[in-house]
Amino acid sequence: MAQTTALREEFVPFQSRIAISAADAACAMLQSLAGSGVLTYYFTRWRGLDPDLAAIVWILFGIWNAVNDPLFGYISDRTRSGLGRRIPYIRFGAPIYALAFIACWVNWPAPSQAVLFVEMLLALFLFDSLYTAIATSIYVMPFEMAVSNKARSTIFVWKIIFSVFPLAVPLVLIPIIQPGPGEDATGYQWTMVAFGIGMAAIIFLSTFFYKEKHYQQAEQQLPFLKALKECFTNRPFIIFEVLSFTIIYVQTGLMQGVLYYFDEINVPALPLYIALAVGIVGGLVLFINRRETWGVKKSMRIMTLLFSLGCFAVLLFGRHMLPTMLGMFCFGIGFSGGMYLVPLMNGDVVDMDEQRTGLRREGMYAGVNSFITKPAISAAQAVFLWFLARFGYDTTLAKGLQSASAETGILVGWTLVPGLLLFLCFVVLHWYPLAGPEWERIKARLSVVHAEKERAYLESKGYRYVE
């Protein structure tokens, strides 16, 4: 008689869920400091790099930033080791990642404009290359750790919770401790060293609490050029990219602008941070509770419109506390919507691709999305610095001494382009097709297909499928 193998429900241990989520937040924490406006502020305000040269750095960096994600994804997918395809990059890349981060804040001697330009460019190139290697591996680890959506979802819940920390630190802590021109930066630099060592330690140690299952790809994928073509002939994906580019641009620009805003605009910070926090929590509760009723499309249109109105409120009335509090409240709704709704919309876009091609191609879409949206980070930095230069911002002045024109430049550079882009998204989303009864029927059919594929695959590995 043939022996029957007992099937068990797939389960991701609690410590594994916490470890990968903490590693994800730690990796993002360093990126939010070095890869955002914090490093730009440090180089232009404290070290004295000309804002126009800093803008050129970000433009050059943007070219590399657009292609290194798909390039590393290609290399990572073909890595073979006893630890797996992803863990070696996370574990052994973490110490080098820390060194690259710390090097960003070293005040090297003879800081001429040319030297500062090269320093910032090399720091960004080295840091982001290591960030890509580690962050990409962490991003796909939930898919290496579990097969079933039910098991994976237990990881994603914790990732959302931990994502609050890399968002909050640049917005709240950095404006308090960052040095202005002529001020002593020793404490600030040691704080950054501590961040680099601490976050890298979390990333490194996390790899001992989870492991890859080494599942092989079950479906034959399309050739590269055909796969690329299928992405760009998927109309919902094009509309999604307009939104995705905008969200990356806006989040980068707003987190950069707040550093300059509190330096020069005489508005109390605490009430604004409270309004932002209330907006984040309130927006998350709102969208979680209303998503089923409104759907992703309507929720996204509401979010982009409110986010846009918040930008224009700060643009017009950013020197006054109450309207700025309203604007920050709308910023919070926008940030929470970006964290919660964008991944759901991305999932619908991939579902539509599966409906068209019969294949599940999250990896290809992630690579193409990075290729399109990564330049948004550089664009946000460069455009903000361009506005500062045009309005006469003087990087040599101490905090609070800029002219009225420079203050206006901060408000314009901080909120004008984000507000316009978000309103454009509100309009473009009118033509987003993945909504309504027909789309729900397609989703229902795909759900049945997924369940059958998942059942067969899990049972072939000895796991019991659970609804």
Model-identified regions with their sequence ranges:
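Membrane-embedded alpha-helical bundles of multi-pass transporters/translocases
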Residues: 2-467
